[in-house]
């Protein structure tokens, strides 16, 4: 029972085997006391890391102590708790079954969820994107063949609206894994770098980030190695970007030292897994003998495309596996499969390293053939087809009103600082893009991540004062590597085709890496960088380094690294190699369309502003907004108020705008009012009697206005009937123009009368008057 875990919620000991085991009742209280004593004796430990003007506090041993590893990372008043748990029995999966979930709680910001159930439902885009960043930072450091279900949960405990929690979560995951007995070759440290007024700022606050031209997250490993990069930038220069990476790596080393100090104080001992799922050297050696020459022939046959190459490799795989099963009948099925994978990867990589050639015949720095086409469909606001090798992407642009942008509720704004967004890019990867069958409903994490990267690439060139919400869709029709960067290229072309005045064209490219490692030192002794990688080069390589930008600078970057760290030198070379390729792609794109169209498509949407005087606003809006709703329903336009007298009208087509304009002109038409003279006396017709006064018209097509009781007579009255007034009766009134505050017409009957000179008693009935003598019907009419 020493290997069991105690669960206080159900008073059970859970053995590490799957079956539950219930303690005898007499032993339960004793077991609970023993666990509590262990907690109190262990205590909690904490370290603080100084990062320039910021301080990072890392603690463990106080919260979530049943987990294999747990930690709380805090900066200012923002705190994130991270737990790590890994099973001790292997998973049937033939890959590393790691799940990372980052969750934001409304309570962390002192708010209540705004949905119907008033609780956290589903996962937001921000949570998914943060989970992906954490996953990419820690996954490369698990040992090869560690196929044990592992879960890392990041729980936002508190957010102060100043310090961003995502970088804290990366560091928290590193601490939780380092302090656990889970096999993991960490730690890693992560920081955010911003450039504000030319200064490099470490972990800038949310307010500082609003004025930063760079948002770079760097995850580093010991010895100044880089594990993960994620960045968006305002088209900054390459040298500034490279320097920011170096600054980030420097500060990650300080965090790593703090974590190592905490691990040393805790005295962590890593568990020994039952087995690591790596094939035996004997089977690999025999596989090498069977398949090496045939694989070499396939990988050096430059006539193959993706489909034929995959078919040829699969044929060799089936033949080899059959022979391996005969030779090693007792071998695990996984060893048979993985042995072939090891040999195939070895042959593929040796060709790149030794012969400087790639499986499609290109040299290391060559691009695939690129072709572009715009204005694919006339009815679309903008469209483009981007083809790079066997990767094909169709991008479209759609305009809508500013009201159609993404709206953030109060909770999201409080936690993330994200406000309304009027530019978005949505990426779709249907199964037919790789000749597969699969579900097409819902949005998976990969699609969201790729779309977010392409959106970052294009956002800096979008004009901030554009009068429409812009939605770019990117549908991958064929995929053989780097579809996210193809989406950035296609999106740029579609934006120019639609007439969006972007400041510059944007292109993106992916750089791959193949390394040779010294088996004794574990360090990279040789490597090759590959420009514009294929899918097979991504699979067999060590890095997928995506970078996008303009001719001038960089707008987005994402580095997925499969090694437990690469030197800064390789990253700098990758950026330089990508910049050369990016400019070459832009030259090809400019041959198709070199600048945005001077005007939008004829069938595109239209936006206009309409001036509605305060005096006409009530009629324009109508009772309960009736006129506005009717206008929007009949014409399809969207109307939003800009200020007191200005309304913005969005129409999906010019014809809809024409209809709306006629409707507005007709409903607000009032020709006679311009002829009314200030201070003149006019004859008004009573159309309605109310408790507060009478509704009158000065001319037939006028909207009735209220003549208040206080302006009916010199004497104070409680109801118009006290004066004998009736519907249809004509009375004399004086015109005093419009009220500048609310635009209402100002009329008075009282000023045409002589002041009252007598005072009488107050009556309580509706016909009573307060001041002066009772007025007969005849006297009223005479007035």
UniProtKB/Swiss-Prot annotation:
The keyword Phosphoprotein applies. One of its GO terms (biological process) is cellular response to oxidative stress. It catalyses: RNA(n+1) + phosphate = RNA(n) + a ribonucleoside 5'-diphosphate. One of its GO terms (molecular function) is identical protein binding. It is a peripheral membrane protein. InterPro entries: ExoRNase_PH_dom1 (IPR001247), ExoRNase_PH_dom2 (IPR015847), ExoRNase_PH_dom2_sf (IPR036345), KH_dom (IPR004087), KH_dom_type_1 (IPR004088), KH_dom_type_1_sf (IPR036612), NA-bd_OB-fold (IPR012340), PNPase (IPR012162). It is an enzyme of class 2 (transferase). Residues 605-664 form the KH domain. Residues 1-45 form a transit peptide. Belongs to the polyribonucleotide nucleotidyltransferase family. This is Polyribonucleotide nucleotidyltransferase 1, mitochondrial.
């Amino acid at each position: 029972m020493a290997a069991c875990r105690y669960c206080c919620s159900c008073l059970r000991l859970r053995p590490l085997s799957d079956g539950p085991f219930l303690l005898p009742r007499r032993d339960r209280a004793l077991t609970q006391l023993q666990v509590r004593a262990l907690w109190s004796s262990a205590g909690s430990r904490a370290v603080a890391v100084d990062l320039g003007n910021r301080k990072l506090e890392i603690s463990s041993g106080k919260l979530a102590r049943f987990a294999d590893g747990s930690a709380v990372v805090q900066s200012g008043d923002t705190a994130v708790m991270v737990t790590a748990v890994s099973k001790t029995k292997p998973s049937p999966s033939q890959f590393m079954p790691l799940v990372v979930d980052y969750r934001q709680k409304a309570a962390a910001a002192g708010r209540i969820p705004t949905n119907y159930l008033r609780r956290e439902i589903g996962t937001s885009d921000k949570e998914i994107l943060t989970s992906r960043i954490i996953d990419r930072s820690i996954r490369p450091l698990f040992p090869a063949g560690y196929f044990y279900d592992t879960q890392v949960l990041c729980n936002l405990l508190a957010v102060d609206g100043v310090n961003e929690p995502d970088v804290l979560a990366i560091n928290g995951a590193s601490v939780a894994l380092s302090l656990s007995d889970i096999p993991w070759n960490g730690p890693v440290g992560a920081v955010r770098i911003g450039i504000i007024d030319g200064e490099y700022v470490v972990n800038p606050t949310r307010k500082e980030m609003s004025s930063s031209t760079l948002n770079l997250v760097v995850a580093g490993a010991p010895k100044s190695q880089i594990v993960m990069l994620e960045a968006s930038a305002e088209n900054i220069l390459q040298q500034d970007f490279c320097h920011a990476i170096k600054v980030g790596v420097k500060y990650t080393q300080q965090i790593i030292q703090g974590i190592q100090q905490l691990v040393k104080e805790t005295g962590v001992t890593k568990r020994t897994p039952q087995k690591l799922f790596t094939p035996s050297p004997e089977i690999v050696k025999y596989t090498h003998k069977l398949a090496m020459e045939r694989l070499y022939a396939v990988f050096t046959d430059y006539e193959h495309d993706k489909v034929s190459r995959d078919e040829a490799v699969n044929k060799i795989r089936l033949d080899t596996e059959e022979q391996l099963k005969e030779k090693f009948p007792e071998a695990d099925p996984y060893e048979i499969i993985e042995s072939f994978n090891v040999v195939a990867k070895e042959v593929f990589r040796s060709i790149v390293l030794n012969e400087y050639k790639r499986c499609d015949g290109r040299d290391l720095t060559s691009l695939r053939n690129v072709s572009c086409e715009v204005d694919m469909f006339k009815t679309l606001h903008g469209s483009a087809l981007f083809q790079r090798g066997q990767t094909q992407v169709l991008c479209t642009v759609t305009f809508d009103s500013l009201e159609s942008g993404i709206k953030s509720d109060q909770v999201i704004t409080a936690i993330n600082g994200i406000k309304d967004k009027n530019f978005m890019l949505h990426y779709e990867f249907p199964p037919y893009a790789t000749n597969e069958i699969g579900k097409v409903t819902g949005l998976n994490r990969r699609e969201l991540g790729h779309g977010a990267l392409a959106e970052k690439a294009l956002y800096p060139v979008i004009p901030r004062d554009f009068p429409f919400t812009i939605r770019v869709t990117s549908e991958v029709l064929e995929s053989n590597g780097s579809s996210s960067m193809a989406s950035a290229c296609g999106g740029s072309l579609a934006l120019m085709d639609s007439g969006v005045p972007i400041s510059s064209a944007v292109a993106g490219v992916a750089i791959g890496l193949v390394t040779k490692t010294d088996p004794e030192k574990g360090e990279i002794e040789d490597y090759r960088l590959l420009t514009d990688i294929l899918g097979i080069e991504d699979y067999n390589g060590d890095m997928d380094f995506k970078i996008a930008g303009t001719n001038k600078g960089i707008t987005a970057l994402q580095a997925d690294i499969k090694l437990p760290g690469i030197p800064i030198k390789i990253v700098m070379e990758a950026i330089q190699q990508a910049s050369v390729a990016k400019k070459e792609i832009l030259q090809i794109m400019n041959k198709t369309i070199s600048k945005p169209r001077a005007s939008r498509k004829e069938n595109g949407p239209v936006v206009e502003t309409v001036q509605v005087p305060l005096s006409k606003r009530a009629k324009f809006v109508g009772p309960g907004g009736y006129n506005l709703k009717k206008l929007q329903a009949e014409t399809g336009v969207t109307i939003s108020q800009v200020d007191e007298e200005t309304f913005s009208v969005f129409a999906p087509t010019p014809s809809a705008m024409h209809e709306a304009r006629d409707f507005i002109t007709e409903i607000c038409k009032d020709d006679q009012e311009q002829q009314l003279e200030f201070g003149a006396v006019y004859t008004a017709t009573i159309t309605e009697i109310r408790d507060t006064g009478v509704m009158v018209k000065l001319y037939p097509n006028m909207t009735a206005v209220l003549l208040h009781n206080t302006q009916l007579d010199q004497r104070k009255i409680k109801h118009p009937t006290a004066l004998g007034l009736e519907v249809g009766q004509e009375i004399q009134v004086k015109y005093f123009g419009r009220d500048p505050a609310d635009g209402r017409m100002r009329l008075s009957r009282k000023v045409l009368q002589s002041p009252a000179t007598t005072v009488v008693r107050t009556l309580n009935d509706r016909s009573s008057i307060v001041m002066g003598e009772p007025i007969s019907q005849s006297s009223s009419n005479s007035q």
